[in-house]
Amino acid sequence: YLLIILGLLLGKLNSKAISPFYTNHTNFKQLTIQDGLKDNTVLSIHKDSKGIMWLGTSTGLSKYDGNHFTNYTLDQYFSMNVRKIEEDSRHILYLQTNDWITYMDCKDENTGRLHTLVKNKDYQVTDFLLLNDSTLFACDNQTLSSFRIMLDQNGHPFSKLEKVYPFEMAKGERFMKFCITNNHRKIYLVTNSARVLLLEISTGRVLKQKRLLTTKHEFGASSVVCHNGKLFISSMLHGIFIMDTSLENLSHIANQQNIFPTHLSHNDVYNIIPISDSSILATTWYGYTMLLADNNIPGGWTTEIRTSEPTWQSLNFEARMISSYYDPHGFLWIGTHGGGVLVSDWKWNFIKQYQRRQCSRKHHY
């Protein structure tokens, strides 16, 4: 009966009722260049449809099958940092490398540059998103563009410009990150001056916009996620901003210096990912923070900060965490600056906590 109960509970890891994060210490395994990783600075992480892990580093791409690494330089002339990885249904990876897009066909491991041309010039990509096998959105400093993806006679992708969305931008203002709504009808774009724009794809109209804060300096948008009716925006200077998808009811979570307790491990937030309907993980320059929906306050959030774990001390690295990936099967991957990648099996943490609760109840009885 215990195994049946545990199976049912583990099946709910992503449900609203149960968060897979717990206050007990979490064990991590570290993988570095000594294990075969191409570089110890890991900028992006992706698990493909075959179960293979792909790690984008500051000098190229690494493939990890659970036992061994295979490394790819991607270009014979340039040192390629891989900041984002997306995959289509044909097992083709699209990589944000420097300021352009590179593809990797996993079937034959052929790589090449996906030329995204606007007015016969290569698009200077600051962010991109693969909508489906045939449509890719990308933004540069001033515009958003959609490209049609097709395959050549060898089955490798190439692109053709479909539409350019122009915007009125202030002097020095530029786009940094964007995301798309679940129904694929609208896009949220974030600029370096902390402005958020809500764009309707079919008409190209800006439906709404909001200023997150007033600043004369760079906002430093690092990621934007639309999840469970909320929009999450992280900044490498100002922490995390949360609001409704209508751009209303703004909340700001930050590290309050010299104030205890604080709400964030560090204001330099490099990445945010959903863990469940009610929990978000933020990786920062100093550890990571879990954001948990507050059951007592509608629309409220509580945070749990991790800046030190027993296993981190034995791994001998600084907790500079800059990327993350959560596998729904229970594995958390965190990329670091200079410390390789950390891996933790969170489902076993859940089982151990469940067993402790059962023992506690028996003792109470």
Name every feature range the model reports, one short phrase each.
Residues 1-365:
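Carboxylate-rich, polar loop motifs that coordinate divalent cations or form catalytic acidic clusters
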